Amino acid sequence: MSSQLDLIPLGKTDLRVTPLGLGIWQWGDTMMWGYGKGYGDADLKPVYEATLAAGINFIDTAEMYGRGRSERVVGQFMAETATRDQLVLATKFAPLPWRLSPGRLLHALRESLNRVGLSQVDLYQIHWPYTPVAIETWMEAMADAVEAGLTRAVGVSNFSPSQTIRAHAALARRGVPLASNQVEYSLLERKPETSGLVKVCRDLDVAIIAYSPIAKGMLTGKYTPANIPPGMRRRLYNRGYLSKIQPLIDLLREIGQAHGDKTPSQVSLNWLICKGAVPIPGAKNLRQARENFGALGWRLTDEEVARLDEESEKVMSHE
């Protein structure tokens, strides 16, 4: 794959990212992903190096991932490889019930910066809306973070259409653009489309970053009614659900074969790219990372996107 990838602006900011990023929730999380058991830092550093070698420049983490471990790991890898200037690095603030003042947001950002070993992050996001505190209050703190030079740009995550509009307006009053809204978005989670969020973000020139773009592994085709995922995912995706999505998996395989034997994961990621989103799949090892890279360098036809839309809607209509 060419190391020269087209770059996409994050809203009206000066940040430019590749069409595919890397989400590193798995880097440090033991509960959902089993960090430290089936994989560890020795597996993750090759993922980091291969990601940059593939020309991908966008990595997304959060203070909540592994209780800060994810931030420390990526900071360590950046320092060891002297690759900070090759990255657009994003992290997130968690508005937990005991830290609801704007000052706590700035304190949390400084703690994140200490963990990644930087004086400034590229994109700082609020991980979810916390309704007891007005969105406008949070956005004032985010604008303060930009003015203090602690972050180049700011975004939100898991915000509804109306919340996105309010965040955008509040930041605009401070002269700060809203870069992005990071939401769960995949062939098995179409709420960004059905809720009107995609249209709102398009109208406001706010980028959509798609987390869980292969539905926590469900769109890989690896899991079937006879092979249920381990851990917490077993509760989310039972045999009945896996049976229901098999026609969609079959279509992903069929379309992938028409594009040089692309995998269901690669087709799923390309579908999101065609939708104008920036997917950020995770990777616990080099094999998974290389499979993600295979979503780049080609494009689904409009007809294939429509077929996937239709099959995906069938799955959701039976939920």
Model-predicted segments: where are they?
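Active-site groove signature of glycoside hydrolases
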Residues: 116-132
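Beta/alpha (TIM)-barrel catalytic core signal, keyed to glycine-rich beta->alpha loops juxtaposed to Asp/Glu
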Residues: 4-7, 129-317
